[in-house]
Design a protein with these regions (language model features):
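Short, mixed-charge low-complexity intrinsically disordered segments
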Residues: 38-69
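A short, charged, amphipathic alpha-helix used as a generic interaction element across diverse proteins
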Residues: 13-16, 21-50
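A short beta-strand micro-motif
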Residues: 1-10
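Generic detector of N-terminal low-structure segments
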Residues: 4-5, 26, 68
Length: 69
């Protein structure tokens, strides 16, 4: 976000939309999609890699059985 706002401010002062502005705009959108996917996985308990499951309470299960009694 820091780099995005820095580039955005420089472009505004210059008065033109250059290649860097478009690149950081796309990068910002890509990060938003990534964080949306990760948040959805955290809420719904979707396995995200190699059998690991992250639950909505933040506990990460790695295939072993946890007994909470």
């Amino acid at each position: 976000m820091f780099f995005y706002t820095t580039i955005e401010n420089q472009v505004r002062n210059d008065g033109s939309r250059g290649l860097l502005y478009d690149h950081f705009d796309d990068l910002n959108a890509a990060y938003a999609k990534l964080y949306t996917i990760l948040a959805a996985a955290a809420v719904s308990g979707i396995p995200y890699h190699s059998g690991h499951i992250i639950r909505s309470d933040g506990l990460i299960l790695d295939g072993r059985v946890f007994d909470r009694r």
